[in-house]
Amino acid sequence: MSGGCGSMYKIEIVSPEFKGKSMINQHRKVNQILKSVIPSLHGLTLVTKSDE
């Protein structure tokens, strides 16, 4: 997913770890894991859900 800049990403994650967690808490978990690479990205779209 890029508007020509090459650094816009869409990440879709399905995990049982997300069960019972709000979307904001799911995204916080992913952001914590990706914190070292996020500054180099122009844009990031997260889609997270549990495997229910």
Curated annotation (Swiss-Prot):
It comes from the Eukaryota. It holds the Pfam family BolA. Signal peptide: none annotated. PANTHER family: BOLA-LIKE PROTEIN 3 (PTHR46188:SF1). Belongs to the BolA/IbaG family. This is BolA-like protein DDB_G0274439. It comes from Dictyostelium discoideum.
